[in-house]
Swiss-Prot record:
Gene that this polypeptide is encoded by: Ccnt2
Gene Ontology MF terms: 7SK snRNA binding; chromatin binding; cyclin-dependent protein serine/threonine kinase regulator activity; RNA polymerase binding; transcription coactivator binding
Source superkingdom: Eukaryota
One Pfam family cited in the UniProt record for this chain: CycT2-like_C
Start and end residues of each stretch annotated as Disordered: 297-325, 340-364, 385-428, 458-645
Protein's UniProt name: Cyclin-T2
Phenotype of gene-disrupted mutants: The homozygous knockout of Ccnt2 is embryonic lethal.
Single GO BP term: skeletal muscle tissue development
Record's compositionally biased regions (Basic and acidic residues): 395-409, 489-503, 517-543, 552-565
Phosphoserine modification, residue list: 477, 596
Domain Cyclin N-terminal: 12-147
Biased composition (Low complexity): 631-645
Protein keywords: Cell cycle, Cell division, Cyclin, Cytoplasm, Host-virus interaction, Isopeptide bond, Nucleus, Phosphoprotein, Transcription, Transcription regulation, Ubl conjugation
Glycyl lysine isopeptide (Lys-Gly) (interchain with G-Cter in SUMO2) crosslink, residue number(s): 404
Length: 723
């Protein structure tokens, strides 16, 4: 929730009130009560991460818990049921509501990790459901329905931006603000602006940085909260450190860190030890005494009232005695193990599930897995490598400044085995100019040789392709028909003509032998007949040839046998069909796939490869074909159309599935370079029978065949192809 300034003062308590809480009146000691609060916050953090809610929701739930126990005792309300209630309510308030069932299951998994999942039908689940719903009402009444919470994180971000603090300092301050909620009761004593100033002040001492005064002569905290003084900051910082000192299990954790420091690095990984010698030892001033940071009057101030970037103090010059430093470092490391210089990861923490519940300290390993948008982590993964002596941080944490990176590497040289050398294979190999030219020449020679071989192979296959296509079959064997991948069946410059040769499907349809096949005399008569006598039948034939697949029938193959001269013309025809089909595709005619449950044949694949090889040459010579190519193309198209019509009329009962009618648009039908404009009717006649699949009304189409047949006849006569 967006927090409005001016929270109710009824939720800020004095020290006397904190010493007289309901838990204290019930006989709970102050340290024990603080331990209960820390463990409750730890449980809320763990549950929030498993429920995948934002860190803002988790922080709000922790504040609910702190305020609730200012009016109720830990002896009457167990923290293990109040924590799920607070998170359940906070998720609703922050608009990240989670199901009650999920909250109860996650709470059970966190509290009892070794037990099986909770069954929703068992009595324990039903009892927890009733308790949580009842406690939610009690919590709302206790809070007085003041559910909007102000957090210090907002003021921390604003102040660090105001003073132009480094990313490292801003992240450390943000981390301290979260720790103040988990480990202290500052949210019950001070306003969020005061807590933000304390966190920034503590982060400055922790990171050994200084924020100078502004051009107006004011300290940075005066811009955040005018009531804050340096004495108050020092006092609260000292109190924060005392709370960290009382945090249990700190020595156990520091011993684990020191044990990890003695382990050698394996497989180029960075050791998971925090740099105690660089960050903790040199920041021991936090424990010895809390003193104010003197202003630097000699620092060049900018012209505006904003603060310049913080400057580092004399880092590395502080000397610490070993007798006292070990205990003090234990205090600091236990409370705030993941500082800006730390490269520790969550694997170094104790992984025992029981210890996570019994230790009252907030488990830091949970903060390492938070999302970067809600919570800024300060832990480094174990797989991050060191290159060029610089510590690279993960993506969640911003990069250090170059000065701090060098300082970290120098100070941590005792913990690491020196910078890891770069991989030998990473550097590019240097090559002289002569060697480069020789290598380039060899590569070019190989490419030319390969292209020459492929061109020769394609030409050879192109020569043998028609020979395989005209191979005859017996009358009783299945007929090989080539079905194009598109439904455009008109003999025009279309994709179907391109696919007929390159991407045709070979469909084997076993049919009974015909009683009497069409003779060559009949085929000749179909071409030589006068247009006046053939007007209606040619209309029907054109509909068949346009609305049926261009099958290559057995008669057409026999015609190719008897006219070997067509073999030479067919090669020109296929080249021209390729160039025409590609040009028509560029005009925007979308081809429709003819669905047939067959695959490509070997002849189709070889012809497709050869056609692709010859595509560029055919496109270059597209406009320079001779009359022989035109006439042969026209003759081949006419004979193919007539033979297909004859075949379909004699065996129309085989094809039980009609092809879809063409779309009602205007097409350019071309026989070679002879083109006639054909306008299809907007409502094509739908076939209703096996014979009607290829027959349409003559009134739906209009075409002047007389000129076309006269031109065909004259061309055939000119070439000596007159039959």
């Amino acid at each position: 929730m967006a927090s409005g300034r001016g929270a109710s003062s009824r939720w800020f308590f004095t020290r006397e009130q904190l010493e007289n809480t309901p838990s204290r009146r019930c006989g709970v000691e102050a340290d024990e009560e603080l331990s209960h609060r820390q463990q409750a916050a730890n449980l809320i953090q763990d549950m929030g991460q498993r429920l995948n809610v934002s860190q803002l929701t988790i922080n709000t739930a922790i504040v609910y818990m702190h305020r609730f126990y200012m009016h109720h005792s830990f002896t009457k309300f167990n923290r293990n049921i109040i924590s799920p209630t607070a998170l359940f309510l906070a998720a609703k308030v922050e608009e990240q509501a989670r199901k009650l069932e999920h909250v109860i299951k996650v709470a059970h998994a966190c509290l009892h990790p070794l037990e099986p999942l909770l069954d929703t039908k068992c009595d324990a689940y039903l009892q927890q459901t009733q308790e949580l719903v009842l406690l939610e009402t009690i919590m709302l009444q206790t809070l007085g329905f003041e559910i909007t919470i102000e957090h210090p994180h907002t003021d921390v971000v604003k102040c660090t931006q105001l003073v132009r603090a480094s990313k490292d300092l801003a992240q450390t301050s943000y981390f301290m603000a979260t720790n103040s909620l988990h480990l202290t009761t500052f949210c019950l004593q001070y306003k969020p602006t005061v807590i933000a100033c304390v966190c920034i002040h503590l982060a400055c001492k922790w990171s050994n940085w200084e924020i100078p005064v502004s051009t107006d002569g004011k300290h940075w905290w005066e811009y955040v909260d005018p009531t804050v003084t340096l004495e108050l900051l020092d006092e609260l910082t000292h109190e924060f450190l005392q709370i960290l000192e009382k945090t249990p299990s700190r020595l156990k954790r520091i011993r684990n860190w020191r044990a990890m420091a003695k382990k050698p690095k394996v497989d180029g990984q960075v050791s998971e030890t925090p740099l105690l010698g660089s960050s903790l030892v040199q920041n021991s001033i936090l424990v010895d005494s809390v003193t104010g940071v003197p202003a630097n009057p000699s620092f060049q101030k900018p012209s505006t009232s904003t603060f310049p970037a913080p400057i580092p103090l004399n880092s590395g010059s502080t000397s610490v005695q070993d007798s006292r430093a070990s205990d003090n470092l234990s205090v600091l490391a236990a409370g705030m193990p993941s500082t800006s210089y730390s490269l520790s990861s969550h694997q170094e923490w104790p992984q025992h599930p029981d210890s996570a519940r019994t230790d009252p300290v907030y488990t830091q390993k949970q903060e390492a897995t938070l999302s970067g948008s809600q919570y800024i982590s300060f832990q480094q993964g174990p797989s991050m490598a060191l290159h060029s002596g610089l510590h690279h941080r993960p993506d969640k944490v911003a990069d250090h400044s170059s000065a701090k990176q060098e300082y970290t590497h120098k100070a941590g040289s005792s913990k690491h085995h020196g910078p890891i050398p770069a991989t030998p294979g990473m550097l590019p190999q240097k090559m002289s100019l002569d060697k480069y030219r020789e290598k380039r020449k060899l590569e070019t020679l190989d490419v030319d040789t390969r292209d020459h071989y492929l061109a020769a192979h394609a030409e050879q296959q192109h020569k043998h392709g028609p020979a395989q296509a005209v191979t005859g079959t017996s009358v009783t064997s299945p007929i090989k028909m080539k079905l194009p991948l598109t439904n455009s069946d008109r003999p025009e410059k279309h994709v179907a003509e391109k696919k007929e040769r390159s991407g045709s499907l070979k469909l084997r349809i076993p049919i009974p032998p015909p009683d009497k096949g069409p003779s060559k005399e009949e085929l000749k008569m179909k071409i030589k007949v006068a247009s006046s006598e053939r007007h209606s039948s040619s209309d029907e034939g054109s509909g068949k040839s346009k609305h049926s697949s261009p099958h290559i029938s057995r008669d057409h193959k026999e015609k190719h046998k008897e006219h070997p001269a067509n073999r030479h013309h067919s090669s020109h025809k296929y080249l021209h069909m390729h160039s025409g089909g590609s040009k028509h595709t560029a005009d925007g005619m979308p081809p429709t796939v003819l669905r047939s449950p067959v695959g490509l044949g070997p002849e189709g694949v070889s012809s497709a490869s050869s056609a692709r090889k010859k595509l560029h040459s055919s496109e270059a010579s597209h406009n320079h074909h001779s009359k022989m190519s035109k006439s042969s193309k026209s003759a081949g198209s006419s004979s193919s159309s007539s033979s297909v019509k004859q075949y379909l009329s004699s065996h129309s009962s085989v094809f039980n599935h009609p092809l879809p009618p063409p779309p009602p648009v205007t097409y350019q039908v071309g026989y070679g370079h002879l083109s006639t404009l054909v306008k299809l009717d907007k409502k094509p006649v739908e076939p209703h029978g096996p014979e009607a699949n290829h027959e349409y009304s003559t009134s739906s189409q209009h075409m002047d065949y007389k000129d076309t047949f006269d031109m065909l006849d004259s061309l055939l006569s000119a070439q000596g192809m007159n039959m």
